[in-house]
C-alpha cells in the first residue's frame, strides 16, 4: 500500500502560452496508443486528463476519457481488433467501453444529451466538466467550458454542478473530499452542504467502489486532509454503524502526514508505505471493510493496527510506546503487525518512534522480527519430539526467550538453546531424549 509520487510540472493555468497550446503540449496526443486520425469527428477528451493537464499533474500515461457521438463500446472493440490490446465493456446500456493497450487506459463513452455541452452538464464537479474538442489534424484542439470550470480551477474551488448530479451516482459525494484533498481545493459551501446532507446515500453504492475511492484518498499526498473531511462530514457513518470497537476509535489525524512521518525518522519510501494503512485504520474497522468486500489480508492488517493503537491509548502508553507493555503483549504486537508496525509508530512521539523504527529496520532484531532460535525440525531431531501443540508451545517459548535477550541472537549457538529447551520440557513434566 503505497502513495504515488507528486507531479512536478508547472500548471498551464499560470503559464504564458495560450491554454490550448499548453494543453496540447502537456497531453502529447502524438504518444497516445490511438492516433488522432482514428478518432471520429466530434470526439472530445473530458474529465481528469484535461483537469490534470491544466494543473500540471499528468503522469506518463494518464487515463484518457473520450466522449464520442457514436457507439463508444463498438469503437473500443474496433480499436482492439486493429491496434491490439483488450476491449472491456463498462456499461452496455450507456455504450461505455475501455481499451487497455501498452500501459494506457482509454474509456470511450457515447455522448449523453444532444450536444457536448449537455453531456458536460451531467457531470459531477465543474473542474471535471472541461472538455478538449480534439482535432483531426496536428493542431491544438478547442477547450469547451460551459460551467466555468477553468475559473474554479484558478480559484482552487471544488463546486458541484447540481445537487441532482451528485445523487445520480452517490459515489460522487465521496469523490468530492478526495478531489479537494488531492488538488488542494476548497469545497464550495453549497456543495459541502449537499455532500453532508446526502451522505447516507453512500450506503447504496457498491462496497467495492466505495473502497476503491477510499484507497485513492488514503494514498494521496494530502490524504490526512481527506480523512479529516470525511470524518468532519460523517460521510462514512452508514458504513461504520456495525459492532462498536473497544477503546478510542476516532484518533486525531494531523500526525498522518509526510511531514510528521519525517519528524519521526521515516524515509519518504517508508512513509509512503505506512501512511495509507494508518489513515485507513483511522477511518474504518474490520466490520466496515468486510461490508466493502475488502480482502481478508487488508481486513486483518487494519484490525491489528487499530487493535494495538487502541490498546496503547486505553493504557495511557502512547507517550511511552509499546516497550511498556508486558512481554507477552509486546511479542504478540510484533508478530501481528510485522510490516505494518510503522503505521503504529506514526501514533507515537517522535523520539519514541525514531528508536523503534531503527530497531524495526534491523531484520535481525529478535523482538521486532521474532523467530525461534531453532526450527521445529531441529527440535524434533535433537529432542525426540513429535509435531503437535507441545512442539508449538516450545517454539513460542524459545522465541520469547530470544526476543528478550535470555537466549543469544546468534542462531548457531544451538547448545544453549537445547539446554533451555530441555529445562522447559522438564518443568512441563515432559521427558526428552537425544
Question: Residue spans of the language-model regions?
Answer:
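Catalytic cores of the polymerase beta-like nucleotidyltransferase superfamily
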Residues: 1-434
Amino acid at each position: 500500500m503505497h502513495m504515488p509520487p507528486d507531479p512536478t510540472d508547472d500548471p498551464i493555468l499560470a503559464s504564458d502560452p495560450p491554454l490550448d497550446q499548453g494543453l496540447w503540449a502537456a497531453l502529447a496526443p502524438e504518444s497516445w496508443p490511438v492516433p488522432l486520425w482514428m478518432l471520429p469527428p466530434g470526439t472530445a477528451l473530458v474529465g481528469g486528463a484535461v483537469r490534470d493537464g491544466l494543473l500540471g499533474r499528468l503522469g506518463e500515461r494518464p487515463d484518457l476519457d473520450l466522449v464520442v457521438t457514436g457507439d463508444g463500446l463498438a469503437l473500443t472493440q474496433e480499436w482492439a481488433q486493429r491496434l491490439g490490446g483488450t476491449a472491456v465493456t463498462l456499461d452496455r446500456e450507456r455504450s461505455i467501453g475501455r481499451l487497455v493497450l501498452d500501459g494506457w487506459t482509454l474509456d470511450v463513452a457515447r455522448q449523453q444529451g444532444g450536444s457536448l455541452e449537455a453531456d458536460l452538464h451531467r457531470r459531477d464537479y465543474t473542474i471535471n466538466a472541461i472538455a478538449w474538442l480534439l482535432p483531426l489534424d496536428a493542431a491544438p484542439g478547442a477547450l469547451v467550458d460551459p460551467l466555468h470550470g477553468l475559473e474554479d480551477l484558478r480559484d482552487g474551488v471544488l463546486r458541484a454542478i447540481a445537487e441532482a448530479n451528485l445523487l445520480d451516482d452517490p459515489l460522487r459525494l465521496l469523490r468530492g473530499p478526495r478531489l479537494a484533498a488531492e488538488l488542494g481545493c476548497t469545497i464550495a459551501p453549497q456543495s459541502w452542504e449537499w455532500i453532508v446532507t446526502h451522505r447516507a446515500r453512500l450506503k447504496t453504492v457498491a462496497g467495492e467502489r466505495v473502497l476503491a475511492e477510499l484507497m485513492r484518498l488514503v494514498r494521496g499526498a494530502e490524504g490526512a486532509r481527506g480523512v479529516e473531511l470525511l470524518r468532519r462530514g460523517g460521510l462514512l457513518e452508514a458504513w461504520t454503524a456495525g459492532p462498536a470497537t473497544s477503546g478510542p476509535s476516532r484518533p486525531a489525524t494531523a500526525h498522518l502526514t509526510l511531514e510528521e512521518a519525517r519528524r519521526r525518522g521515516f524515509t519518504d519510501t517508508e512513509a509512503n508505505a505506512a501512511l495509507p494503512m494508518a489513515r485507513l485504520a483511522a477511518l474504518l474497522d474490520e466490520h466496515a471493510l468486510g461490508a466493502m468486500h475488502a480482502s481478508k489480508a487488508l481486513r486483518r492488517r487494519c484490525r491489528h493496527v487499530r487493535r494495538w493503537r487502541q490498546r496503547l491509548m486505553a493504557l495511557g502508553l502512547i507517550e511511552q510506546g509499546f516497550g511498556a507493555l508486558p512481554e507477552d503483549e509486546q511479542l504478540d504486537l510484533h508478530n501481528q503487525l510485522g510490516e505494518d508496525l510503522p503505521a503504529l509508530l506514526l501514533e507515537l512521539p517522535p523520539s519514541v518512534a525514531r528508536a523503534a523504527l531503527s530497531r524495526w529496520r534491523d531484520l535481525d532484531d529478535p523482538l521486532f522480527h521474532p523467530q525461534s532460535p531453532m526450527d521445529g525440525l531441529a527440535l524434533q531431531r535433537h529432542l525426540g519430539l513429535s509435531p503437535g501443540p507441545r512442539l508449538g508451545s516450545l517454539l513460542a517459548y524459545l522465541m520469547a526467550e530470544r526476543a528478550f535477550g535470555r537466549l543469544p541472537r546468534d542462531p548457531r549457538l544451538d547448545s544453549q538453546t537445547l539446554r533451555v529447551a530441555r529445562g522447559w520440557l522438564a518443568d512441563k513434566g515432559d521427558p526428552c531424549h537425544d
